[in-house]
Amino acid sequence: NDIYAGNNYGVFGKYTSGSRAIDVLTSNAPNYLPVIAAGNDRNTKFENQYLNASKNGYDLLTHDAVSKNAVVVAAIDGFTSYTNAGSVIMSDFSQWGPTDDFRIKPDISAKGIGVYSSNMPSASSENSYASYQGTSMAAPAVTAVFALWQQYFKELNSFVGLQNMKAASLKALMAHTASEAGVY
């Protein structure tokens, strides 16, 4: 998902030219809403040190995950029922903010552990599905919800000629219908 710098983690939490590029793009295309995986390296050690250790495990987002107009998705473990924010268990790998300008990111979380997904069959296995984990498994669930909302919006508003909700409306709907997650 990081289209700017393969293994280069950049400056944590900083609003970069890459972040700005996404915001300019979305500003010029008001129906376009990028959904970006937050990253999976929160507890990864490099040279015997956690990423951005000076921030005590926070402020780990880089590049496109710091953009203002994209929806950034964290990965959580699944849960059977929601009773309160403590019902939601954050994965031990999902990266999170805040950003250097104190915005709260990721914007939302979805199940990212034990997600059954398509798999490339190999010579040793013909199984076309496997269980995976990661923020790249959580982000498609959020994208699917947005697609369902768009479909419902079209069904409700087709008689007046409205085709799609704007990206800002989707983000607002997400923010106002999600339940608090975690005790962080």
Give the role of each language-model region.
Residues 110-184:
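Hydrolase catalytic cores
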Residues 27-31, 94-101, 149-163:
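Flexible, small-residue-rich helix->loop connector segments that border functional cores
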Residues 64, 68, 86-117:
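Internal glycine-rich alpha/beta core junctions
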Residues 73:
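Alpha-helical segment proximal to the catalytic Tyr-Lys
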Residues 41-42, 77-80, 113, 179-182:
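Acidic glycine-/aspartate-rich tracts in secreted/extracellular proteins
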Residues 13-20, 88, 165-169:
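A general alpha-helical scaffold signature found inside nucleotide-binding enzyme cores
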Residues 1-67, 80, 100-103, 117, ...:
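Substrate-binding/access-modulating region of protease and related hydrolase catalytic domains
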